[in-house]
Amino acid sequence: MQHQDVAIIIPSRLSSTRLKQKPLQLIGSTTLIERVFKQVNQANLEHTYVATDSEEIANIIKKVGGKVIFTDSAIPTGTDRTYEAFKLIPNNQNINYIVNVQGDMPFIEPSSILKIIEYLKNSEYDIVTPVVKVDRESVEASSNVTVAVDSAGKALYFSRSLIPNGAEKFLYHVGMYGFRKNALEKFVSLKPTFLEKTERLEQLRVLENGMTIGTCLVENVPISVDTEDDLKKAVKFYENISKLGL
């Protein structure tokens, strides 16, 4: 298998404020978390784990051959859960990069995961995250996050508002992060910052503390399931691709 020095961790917590028991919601006959895991597993990396506080989620993943790490339900964020899971990986001293894939993207493309790994390894950024070029209509449709970057693709700011103001094209931020090990360790040691709390975006903690985030372009915006409406969109998308035999 490729990238033996990389761990992919999918944090998945049973409790959810906007969509009850979100990881267990069905898309077709398959739970959300199983779909996410199967997509991620196509990247074919040995160190792929689901980090959870739930026996039910763990059993689902184990039945399809996945590896599970149990983490405390009191852990506040997905990034903290990712770090706690990383510390519990056997022989983790050989892992230098950690990819945090959110457990709510049932159609995430494995190629996007591999792209951020390659980009991270061939750059000097602390963290790398994918972005998609979109028009105004695409990002106005829901509470998406956009990012402003410099000429080299280094992130300058992330916002739930459309940035840069007045533009017609935007960079949609895909909620997936590739960390250098020392960057993840530093991130979880830092206290939440003013901008992070104002925008409700963890990644601003990174920028406010002088760390760097590189962006890499990917082709498609993955569906994220946070609400009942999102779930309906995911089910409809699944039904459409099923009709096409994809």
Curated annotation (Swiss-Prot):
One Pfam family hit: CTP_transf_3
SUPFAM superfamilies: Nucleotide-diphospho-sugar transferases
InterPro entries: Cytidylyl_trans, KdsB, Nucleotide-diphossugar_trans
Pathway the protein contributes to: Nucleotide-sugar biosynthesis; CMP-3-deoxy-D-manno-octulosonate biosynthesis; CMP-3-deoxy-D-manno-octulosonate from 3-deoxy-D-manno-octulosonate and CTP: step 1/1; Bacterial outer membrane biogenesis; lipopolysaccharide biosynthesis
One GO term describing the cellular component: cytosol
Record's keyword terms, sorted: Cytoplasm, Lipopolysaccharide biosynthesis, Nucleotidyltransferase, Transferase
Catalytic activity: 3-deoxy-alpha-D-manno-oct-2-ulosonate + CTP = CMP-3-deoxy-beta-D-manno-octulosonate + diphosphate
Highest taxon listed in the record's lineage: Bacteria
Alphabetical list of Gene3D superfamilies matching this protein: Spore Coat Polysaccharide Biosynthesis Protein SpsA, Chain A (3.90.550.10)
Function: Activates KDO (a required 8-carbon sugar) for incorporation into bacterial lipopolysaccharide in Gram-negative bacteria.
Similarity-based family: Belongs to the KdsB family.
UniProt xrefs under HAMAP family: KdsB
Protein name per UniProt: 3-deoxy-manno-octulosonate cytidylyltransferase
